[in-house]
């Protein structure tokens, strides 16, 4: 059976996230998804509870050279990972695997902080090749990730990188599973039985709202910059559609 999962979603536990788990799950259900992976910034959010879709425990680790998704975590990452600041990509992947998770670089070419050779040397479990926010800014970076996955024979994932319920499902992953369960989804990803799907890009307004929300407790100068950016984003959607 094919299970549809958005494997990159942020909740209000992220500094720039704006929706709680219930709203994210309801949005996923309304868009025909079966599961979402909650991957907050450097935080392992508790996803226990009753929801209309499966919630996959995850994290998005900000490393010294890009972001690493941890999917299907069996326990939260040890906070010691961040004791000296941002961890290296290797340390992040090792920590994710130590917690039973699968590691996948997120939007690895937007921006590209590792050479192709260095990225390949990490031997990740999968790689994100469809990201709805990258599709907004530079869709060629998604294509570059797809080409890299083919070259390296890596499992692929797709995720919206949603920071609110309205963004859920912009990109998602189809997993060929034996059943609709976390264990079956994890097994499908580990075996590479996946397909990354692009549905639609994020809007500039949603991206601007994330920046504004993230700056709400920041010093006044940063808040002013975030507000100006939001205004530019709204105008960009209104007058250019890009």
What does each of the following model-derived ranges do?
Residues 1-7, 11, 17, 21-22, ...:
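Charged catalytic cores and adjacent phosphate/nucleic-acid-binding surfaces used
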Residues 25, 90-93:
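Generic structural signal for well-ordered alpha-helices
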């Amino acid at each position: 059976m094919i299970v549809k999962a958005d494997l990159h979603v942020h909740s209000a536990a992220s500094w720039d996230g704006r929706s709680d788990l219930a709203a994210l799950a309801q949005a996923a259900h309304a868009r025909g998804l079966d599961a979402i992976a909650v991957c907050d910034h450097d935080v392992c959010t508790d996803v226990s509870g009753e929801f209309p879709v499966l919630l996959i425990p995850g994290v998005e680790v900000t490393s010294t050279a890009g972001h690493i998704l941890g999917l299907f975590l069996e326990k939260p990452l040890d906070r010691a990972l961040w004791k000296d600041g941002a961890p290296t990509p290797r340390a992040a992947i090792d920590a994710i695997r130590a917690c039973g998770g699968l590691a996948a670089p997120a939007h690895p070419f937007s921006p590209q902080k590792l050479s192709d050779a260095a990225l390949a040397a990490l031997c990740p479990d999968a790689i994100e090749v469809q990201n709805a926010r990258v599709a907004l800014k530079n869709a060629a970076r998604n294509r570059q990730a797809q080409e890299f996955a083919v070259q390296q024979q890596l499992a692929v994932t797709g995720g919206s990188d949603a920071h609110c319920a309205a963004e859920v499902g912009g990109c998602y992953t189809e997993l060929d599973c034996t059943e609709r369960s976390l264990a079956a989804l994890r097994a499908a990803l580990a075996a590479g039985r996946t397909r990354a799907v692009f549905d639609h890009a994020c809007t500039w307004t949603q991206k601007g709202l994330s920046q504004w929300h993230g700056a709400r407790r920041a010093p006044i100068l940063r808040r002013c910059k975030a507000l100006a950016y939001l205004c530019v984003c709204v105008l960009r959607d209104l007058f250019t559609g890009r």
